[in-house]
From Swiss-Prot:
GO terms for biological process: 'de novo' pyrimidine nucleobase biosynthetic process; 'de novo' UMP biosynthetic process. Heterotetramer of 2 PyrK and 2 PyrD type B subunits. The gene is pyrD. FMN binds at S21, K45, A46, N99, N127, K165, I191, G217, G243, G244, G265, T266. It comes from Listeria monocytogenes serovar 1/2a (strain ATCC BAA-679 / EGD-e). This is Dihydroorotate dehydrogenase B (NAD(+)), catalytic subunit. It holds the Pfam family DHO_dh.
Length: 304
């Protein structure tokens, strides 16, 4: 038995570690440095129906314990991704999780109906942190009813399991998670970035041209752990955890809190080899902590 194996809807993972969406592109650059078959899965860059240039620059800023970004979902659009990006990933055995974004419900439905055409795509990650342009720009993921409706609409057309990415910028993460689960979501990914800002002391203006950006990195890990623990306390829905993972101890902390697998984001920019390193280190750390397998760790968590 593979002691690192994880089975969740649509995904047979050889290990629980994967790069997070937006921090790995579509894998081509990283494939020059290591075998992508080492990874548990790959969360690909967000896809929208039409190409997007993203936000004006500067759109990235370092912080004391992480970074801010306001990339604006820059991507080449659905047709290009289906024709050029996903075919490259089909050579690997590693399952691909396609991140889908949009400005309207129709955008999401359009992409989700077709993204499964690639045999590499085994699941969808629904990015509901996007502003809903038909409802005053408020993010889809901040209202339980809107999140429920969008999830249901996507589930009606998707040919692969749907994991919904939760925004931490809400008053009650549990009510959002429960609404999404009730709509038929196969799993959750959490958390997305926290809204933040930095000021340039010389210009007296925000460093990010957009004003605000998403805070990621080690600074948000305690928030991610807390939110995963809260959702796990009321639901058995599969969870892919993310938010500030740097070390193998972070991976285990996420798993103990309630995640079934873990995605690594910002650290890919600091160390492109972070994912294979964590995969290599995980069994040794499990031995030191008396963890025989991830399956047993999950049973231990369930019985508490």
């Amino acid at each position: 038995m593979n002691r690192l194996a994880v089975e969740i809807p649509g995904l047979s993972l050889k290990n629980p570690i994967m790069p997070a969406s937006g921090c790995f592109g579509f894998g081509q650059e990283y494939s020059k440095y290591y075998d992508l078959n080492e990874l548990g899965a790959i969360m690909a860059k967000a896809v929208t129906p039409e190409p997007r240039l993203g936000n004006p620059t500067p759109r990235v800023a370092e912080t004391a314990s992480g970074m801010l970004n306001a990339i604006g979902l820059q991507n080449p659009g659905l047709e290009h991704v289906l024709a050029h990006e996903l075919p490259f990933l089909e050579q690997f055995e590693t399952p691909i999780i396609a991140n889908v974004a949009g400005a309207t419900e129709d955008d999401y439905v359009q992409v989700c109906a077709r993204i499964g055409e690639s045999k590499a795509v085994k699941a969808i990650e629904l990015n509901i942190s996007c502003p809903n342009v038909k409802h005053g720009g408020i993010a889809f993921g901040t209202d339980p009813e809107v999140a429920h409706r969008l999830t249901k609409a996507v589930k009606n057309v998707a040919s692969v399991p749907v994991y919904v990415k939760l925004s931490p910028n809400v008053a009650d993460i549990v009510s959002i998670a429960q609404a999404i689960e009730a709509a038929g979501a196969d799993g959750l990914t959490m958390i997305n970035t926290l809204l933040g800002m930095r000021i340039d002391l010389k210009t007296r203006k925000p460093i990010i041209a957009n004003g605000t950006g998403g805070l990621s990195g080690p600074a948000i890990k305690p928030v991610a752990i807390r939110m995963i623990h809260q959702v796990r306390a009321v639901s058995n829905i599969p969870i892919i955890g993310m938010g500030g993972v740097q070390t193998v101890d972070d991976v285990l902390e996420f798993l103990i809190a309630g995640a079934d697998a873990v995605a690594v984001g910002t650290m890919n920019f600091t160390d492109p080899f972070i994912c294979p390193k964590l995969i290599s280190e995980l069994p040794k750390r499990m031995d030191a902590l008396g963890i025989s397998s991830l399956q047993d760790l999950k049973k231990e968590r369930t019985n508490q």
